Amino acid sequence: MRNFTIETADGRLLAWANSNWTNLVISKGIPARLTPADTDNYVLSEKMEMDYAPRKISLPDGMISQEPFQVQKHHLDTNHHVNNCQYICMAEDFLPEKFKVYQMRAEYKMQAKLGDMICPKAKVESGKVVVSLDDEKGKPYAIVELAEK
């Protein structure tokens, strides 16, 4: 688990986050054992006080299939798969007009690569939009939840 904040120069809190990470052996797709070289640059501190959402995002009933699209070069990161931020941008395409995002949650499931098809499903509920960005078999690459205050 990793907590972090973004603050102004005078210490006013602008944003805060909690994220869960797994260090992987990329060639095998399995968790890697951490070494001192992986951890020495990080300082452990107390868990921040905040509302901690569940790790998994629940898909609501009645998700509506949207127009599929193909992964393009501009979606890719240096590892040649879709950059995590791009999944958020894709999900934002399904926000209603004047929706003001207060909270974003993302669950990254598998890597999409150049040429893969993204088959989105979305559901707008009161104060919240949930988007599942799936492969052609309906398996999610990422699930994104955007909520208003």
Residue ranges and their predicted role:
Residues M1-R55, A112-L114, K123-K149:
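HotDog/MaoC-like acyl-thioester-processing domains
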Residues V25-F99:
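Hot-dog-fold acyl-thioester-processing enzymes
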Residues N20-T22, P68-H75, E107, A147:
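Generic structural detector for well-ordered beta-strands
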Residues L95-E125:
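A conserved acidic, glycine/proline-rich C-terminal tail/linker
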